[in-house]
C-alpha cells in the first residue's frame, strides 16, 4: 500500500547550504520532518550545483513522517542577474534600463531552464526568459 501524503512544502534553499537554522528548521520541524536528515540529503543532492545558488525544492511529506523532495533549477531571475552582472533589476522597469543581455545568453538560460518551464520548444522558452528580462528592466539585444 502506498504511503499517505500529509502535505507538500515549497522552499528555496541555497545549494549546499541547507542547515537547521531558520527558515528551514522551523518550516520542517512544525510538520514533523526530520530536519537533519533533510539537510544532509539536500546538501548531498545539490553538491554538483553552484554553491550558494538558490534552489527551489518541493518537499512531499507523509503521515509516517518520512519525506521525498524534488529539486528544480534556480529561478530565471538568478540566471539573468548572473549573466548581466547585476545585483538587482531596475527599480522602474520600462523607464530606466538596468543593463543589457544578448539573445545568446537568453538561449543558454532557456536551455538550462527548459525542463522546469511550461514551453513546447526552445523558442517559446526564450520568449518567456525575454519577458522576465524586460520585467527586470533588462534590454535584450542581438
Curated annotation (Swiss-Prot):
Assembly mode: Part of the ribosomal stalk of the 50S ribosomal subunit. Interacts with L10 and the large rRNA to form the base of the stalk. L10 forms an elongated spine to which L12 dimers bind in a sequential fashion forming a multimeric L10(L12)X complex.
Signal sequence bounds: none
Entry keyword annotation includes Oxidoreductase: no
GO terms assigned for molecular function: large ribosomal subunit rRNA binding; structural constituent of ribosome
Pfam family, any one: Ribosomal_L11
Regions annotated as coiled coil: none
Gene Ontology BP, a term: translation
InterPro entries attached to this UniProt entry: Ribosomal_uL11 (IPR000911), Ribosomal_uL11_bac-typ (IPR006519), Ribosomal_uL11_C (IPR020783), Ribosomal_uL11_C_sf (IPR036769), Ribosomal_uL11_CS (IPR020785), Ribosomal_uL11_N (IPR020784), Ribosomal_uL11_N_sf (IPR036796)
Gene: rplK
Keywords from the named record: Methylation, Ribonucleoprotein, Ribosomal protein, RNA-binding, rRNA-binding
Organism: Brucella anthropi (strain ATCC 49188 / DSM 6882 / CCUG 24695 / JCM 21032 / LMG 3331 / NBRC 15819 / NCTC 12168 / Alc 37) (Ochrobactrum anthropi)
Protein name: Large ribosomal subunit protein uL11
